[in-house]
Amino acid sequence: IVVKADGLAAGKGVVVAQTEAEAIEAVNAMMEDHIFGASGGRIVIEECMVGEEASLLAFVDGKTIVPMISAQDHKRIFDNDEGPNTGGMGAYAPAPVVTPEIRKEVEEKILKPVVDGLKQEGITYQGCLYAGLMITADGPKVVEFNCRFGDPETQAVLPLLDGDLAQIMYACAKGTLTADMVHWKDAAACCVIMASAGYPASSHKGDVISGLDAVDKEDVMVFHSCLLYTSP
């Protein structure tokens, strides 16, 4: 089964329990030890879906939905998909597991019903809608939704955008989004996360990051997160 903290936990509030003992340990850690603070005061226990994970983000203006290139996030801290889940140790785009047929199914049977359902409840959803998916033998299933861009998927997806992101987001806000506004490069991108020692349980703080001046290739970008800049 899967044990989840019901609140925000920076992408780390999920434990895939292989045994009853692991499930009990996860529940106790969240609800008694409060490892996620108030976010773990209530938990969700779900079926553990078997398949390959993928993320499909979409631009939405309230009525029009334009999916982005698919991506796959890798959450385990160690190589070979081992260790605890993190906020994401890397991602690549596009994800081959999301075939054109699956992409169409997700758009029509998952994204559109969500946007339409929100509208029926008086919510005009505009911006980025993130669908975390499990591609199973029975087709795509929803793992989670986020009302934001994915991290680290975005770092792999947006460099492939062949257009003006600001104009696209403005169209989302104004309700004038069209599919022909969004174009993608015929390429692939990969994002690799560098994290401090101890992550994700208790990250070491204060380490100096050096060597970034060596990153001088046109097709390589460095994105910063959770750090403090101080002058030499």
Predicted regions and their residues:
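A generic local structural motif
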Residues: 2, 30, 177-179
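Structural detector of well-ordered beta-strand residues that form the stable sheet scaffold
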Residues: 2, 44-46, 223
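Residue-level signal for inorganic ion chemistry
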Residues: 4, 87, 192
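Internal nucleotide-binding/catalytic subdomain
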Residues: 13-154
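Active-site "cap" helix and flanking loop/linker of ATP-utilizing ligase/carboxylase catalytic domains
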Residues: 106-129, 146-219, 224-226
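Conserved small/polar residues in nucleotide/adenosyl-binding loops
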Residues: 229-232
